[in-house]
Amino acid sequence: VDAVGTACMLHSNIAAQYQSLRADFFAQPGVTRMTAAEHTEGDSRGTGAVGMVDAAAFRKNAGLKREVFGPFTLLVTCEDQEDLTRTLAGIEGQLTATLLGNEAEIQSASALVALLSEKVGRLLVNGVPTGVEVCPGMQHGGPYPATTDSRFTSVGTDAVKRWIRPLSFQNFPGGVLPPALKDDNPLGILRMVNGKMTTDPI
């Protein structure tokens, strides 16, 4: 990680907040700093950092469960599967979680999958969550405090639903309906009619 160098962050204030939180994490009891690279004061660039702590210390310290927005990783070491389960049960909502393993290993971890499904908005296998594609299948949200409303995504086709609400027009004459609802479909858009998606006029 030290050899990677720095990267420009989104804003100088974000870089300053990252530096502050990173320093605070490394000052916590039981946290071992695994990287040596330092951050340059006043610079908008972020330096990657890795810390390590054992699961018992992590569970006792709520401050270690905060998000550090930037190139920071905290490795939490667990003694066994029970220790891992206890630790994950105590974390709050997250945007993502990744499981690393082959198919047989993932199948044997069904209880872990079920636990993580309650904690995150996107669950990955052998992948990294940094690729946030704008597509219908993308879910970039999660239980609080990852987001304030876990029913929505902030990226992807469904993200627009954060800003709209359903409205039904019942028994309206066709001439006064909005264009998107007119029988002849003047906009040529895809609509659900009698349970089927179609662009055909009614």
Descriptions of predicted regions:
Residues 1-95:
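NAD(P)-dependent aldehyde/semialdehyde dehydrogenase
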Residues 4, 63, 142-143, 186:
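Generic signal for short, ordered secondary-structure residues
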Residues 41-43, 81, 86-177, 197-199:
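C-terminal core of ALDH-fold dehydrogenases
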